[in-house]
Amino acid sequence: AIVLYLNQYPYQPRERDYAYAGSFYAFAIWIGFGVLYLWDLLQKKMDSRNAAIIVTAVCLFAVPVNMAAQNWDDHDRDGRYATIAHAKNYLSSCAPNAILFTYGDNDTFPLWYAQEVEGFRRDVRIVNLSLLAGDWYIDQMKRKAYESDGVPISFTKDQYHAGVRDFVTIEERVQQPFSMKEVMEFVASDRPETKSNRYQGGAVDFIPTRNLYIPVDKEKVLVNGTVQPEDSALIVDRVEIQLKGNSLTKSQLMVLDILATNNWERPIYFGVGMGQDSYMGFDKYFQLEGAAYRVVPIKTENNAAYYDFGRINTEILYDNLMNKFVWGNIKDPKVNIDHFHDN
């Protein structure tokens, strides 16, 4: 009944046992009957008080021992450090002083642990897209942290605080592409002509075109290593994207602003485990270098295959895989590797 009522869609991010807590009552009732049966059996041979004490002691001991005996072998995590290894591999995929966009908790919290507790690659600034809609989080991103400079965001506090530009509509008033930097300045402005009055509830910030671009300084991207010299002929004049949907969230707006304001100064990466919608059209300019995609001014048309984005820099990828990545003892035969880690 619970399964039918909740009707959860397939491929949940984790086993949601807590959703079925009500069904556990049935097992608890039968366990209670079992305890009562043992007490009834013993109290025929001794007084009820002693029978109750013995049954309670036996059950309190037998249940956890039985659980351990049945589950220890496939729950043993001794010597398994695959999670922290995976987090370090994410960070190792990034060039120095990089900005790394992540999305959920599973691809963010282990990275925070690696940086905060183990002091690993503190030059990389992790930007969690799920939190980027919060003004308090944007404040944090703009500040320097450890060895990482603040994230380049052009919006001021009064332009992104709670309740301001929580969403921005997309109105295709012009077809021609505009510089992403110019569009961000347009959205940040409080001039009356930058507001739309098409909606109930007052004026709303809007973007007047779907077609945006970031100009490319070819000399700069070659000098700072964004593009390798052997790929210089592939550099495009500008990175172009087309916005989808009818509006942008504050988080999406900040992503565009970061990419525009950065102006190819710092390396920018997106995590490999994110949904395609989070890439906002930049996936045509991705370069796989490990566990993250780097945004580069080289256009690669995506294949139809799922999660087949951009190009691969085989030299950097090979160096990361063979010389920088760690694997958390997964090759040790004594370490329990379950099917999640096999995948």
Residue ranges of predicted features:
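ER/secretory pathway lumenal C-terminal domains and tails of membrane proteins involved
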Residues: A1-A21, A26-N97, A114-N343
